[in-house]
Amino acid sequence: MNNLTAIVLAGGQSSRMGQDKALITVQGVPLLQFVCNIAASCADTVYIVTPWPERYEHLFLPGCKFLPEAATQGPLIGFAQGLAEVKSEWVLLLACDLPKLRVEVLQEWAANLDSVPEEAIAALPHHAKGWEPLCGFYRRRCLPQLLEFIHQGGRSFQQWLQHHSVQVLSLPTPEILFNCNTPEDLAVIQGEFDDLSPNPSPTRRGA
């Protein structure tokens, strides 16, 4: 899929985590850097929408551009701000706290965007709680409807999406949508990665 733009949202308060989720490291890599590097493997341009670009300037983010957010007003408004900069037909929207995100899944989804019905404004995974709005694709032309919804006081992705046609993306493994919202979530993901690490070589007798 050519001419794809990505938007990564890094404007949350991280109140439940107690620290900036974007800077939490998993296997030594900050989450924002991890997500942006995957986004850059799928998209020509990656925008990072955040009120605090200075927090993240030290990260290794090749090909990424910061879009300073005026204030933390929620992901829907952050997305609208980023979408206003997009020139491509499709945009990949990602949260910054997806430690199990897999580039091959995103690339497969992107490769099939040409088959999404014309009336659909988005292509997203769906689960028991509804749409997963922060790991999927949107058509640029949805911006006017999005702005109208926001101007009417809307702030919920779920409420906005229920008024529009959305294509369901097949989810090969639900775990890629796992996000780190709490210290308990972080402990789970770090424990799983630790379990995947190779065991240290046993010390030889007499060494």
Curated annotation (Swiss-Prot):
CDD domains referenced in this protein's UniProt entry, alphabetically: MobA (cd02503)
What the entry lists under InterPro entries is as follows: MobA-like_NTP_Trfase (IPR025877), Molybde_CF_guanTrfase (IPR013482), Nucleotide-diphossugar_trans (IPR029044)
Q: Where in the cell is it found?
A: Cytoplasm
Cofactor names: Mg(2+)
Q: Which top-level group of life is the source organism from?
A: Bacteria
Regarding domains, what does the record say? The N-terminal domain determines nucleotide recognition and specific binding, while the C-terminal domain determines the specific binding to the target protein.
- Top enzyme class, one word, equals transferase
- Coarse class of the primary localization is cytoplasm
**Any single GO CC term annotated in Swiss-Prot or TrEMBL for this entry:** cytoplasm
**Record keywords: Cytoplasm included?**
yes
Sequence similarity: Belongs to the MobA family.
Its keywords, alphabetically, are: Cytoplasm, GTP-binding, Magnesium, Metal-binding, Molybdenum cofactor biosynthesis, Nucleotide-binding, Transferase
Show the PANTHER family listed in the entry.
MOLYBDENUM COFACTOR GUANYLYLTRANSFERASE (PTHR19136:SF81)
**Residues engaged in binding Mg(2+):** 97
Using the chain's own numbering, where are the disulfide bonds? Answer: none
Q: Which reaction does it catalyse?
A: Mo-molybdopterin + GTP + H(+) = Mo-molybdopterin guanine dinucleotide + diphosphate
- Which GO terms fall under biological process for this protein? Mo-molybdopterin cofactor biosynthetic process
Name of the protein in question: Probable molybdenum cofactor guanylyltransferase
| GO molecular-function terms, A-Z | GTP binding; metal ion binding; molybdenum cofactor guanylyltransferase activity
The protein's Enzyme Commission number: 2.7.7.77
Q: Which residues bind GTP?
A: 9-11, 21, 97
- What role does it play? Transfers a GMP moiety from GTP to Mo-molybdopterin (Mo-MPT) cofactor (Moco or molybdenum cofactor) to form Mo-molybdopterin guanine dinucleotide (Mo-MGD) cofactor.
